[in-house]
Design a protein with these regions (language model features):
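Nucleotidyltransferase catalytic core that binds NTPs
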Residues: 1-178
């Protein structure tokens, strides 16, 4: 369940999913810039239990990634960790997460935060049209990726963020730690 404030007030929340293998400074900066530019009350970080696009052997254990993510956001009052994908068995599909969160939090307006690298293949995601119908898509630029909507059918649901481009990746961090 989401470790978020429990009030009767409507909220605007950004859903920031990822493997967070590990969470790093670029994730924190992006989440903060998105929260600020879009006037979000909170950003919910959602570590993927079993992402459909990554090999299991490249990932730290899900409980370890969840713990790292909690530590990373601990000092940020507008950031929360949502373990919905960790609690749900099987592959983590964004559309299922969005459906469940909208059902659990009907007064909350959600937006999906993704990198421009993910936007490039968003049309290949599981049920992308339903995702785009349910939530706006907030896109931050990733290094080396062109900032444009590959599929015009999603263009009116995509909003780009003016965020600093960070040359940091979990892959690079893991390689330096070996």
């Amino acid at each position: 369940m989401t470790e978020a404030r429990q009030t009767g007030d409507a909220m605007d929340v950004g859903l920031f999913g990822g493997s967070f293998n590990p969470p790093h400074i670029a994730h924190l900066i992006v989440a903060d810039v998105v929260r600020d530019q879009f006037g979000l009350d909170e950003v919910w970080w959602i570590p993927n239990a079993t992402p459909p696009h990554k090999e299991d052997d490249a990932l730290a254990g899900v409980e370890h990634r969840l713990a790292m993510t909690r530590r990373a956001v601990d000092d940020h009052p507008s950031f929360r960790v949502c373990d919905i994908e960790v609690q749900r068995a099987g592959v983590s599909y964004t559309v299922e997460t969005i459906r469940a969160l909208q059902e659990q939090h009907p007064e909350t307006d959600f937006g999906l935060i993704i990198g421009s690298d993910s936007l490039d293949h968003f049309g290949n995601w599981h049920r992308p049209d339903e995702i785009a119908d349910r939530v706006p898509i907030i896109v931050y630029k990733r290094p080396g990726v062109i900032e444009e909507v590959a599929e015009p059918r999603f263009a009116n649901r995509v909003h780009f963020v003016s965020a600093p481009v960070m040359e940091v990746s979990g892959t690079e961090i893991r390689a330096r730690c070996r």
